Amino acid sequence: MVYICSPLRANARFTMEENLERAKAICRHCAVNGVLAIAVHLYFTQFLDDNIEEERVCGMEHGKALLAMCEEVWVFGDIISSGMQAEIELAEELGIPIKYFPDVDAWLGGKIC
């Protein structure tokens, strides 16, 4: 299983909604190409509110537990958020291989948003 690490919150380039759409596109691309991938920020935001700090922390902690079960971490985008950095550092500590894909649109084969 591959852990998808990409931004959730709005940044200099994308809104939160756009970041979620990009994560969905990444996961869809993985699925149709035979890669079992999980993007915890897509899953946990279905029932936890990322704007409530307590719920955000809960989601991040559960996400770290899932990350520890993965064989690889794939990092998408050229903007690394603080949450992404924490995931990268955890993967490094656990010895989980990390792959970087700074150009999401190129990786997907075309612009998605």
Residue ranges and their predicted role:
Residues 1-113:
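Catalytic phosphate/metal-binding cores of nucleic-acid and nucleotide-processing enzymes, i.e., regions
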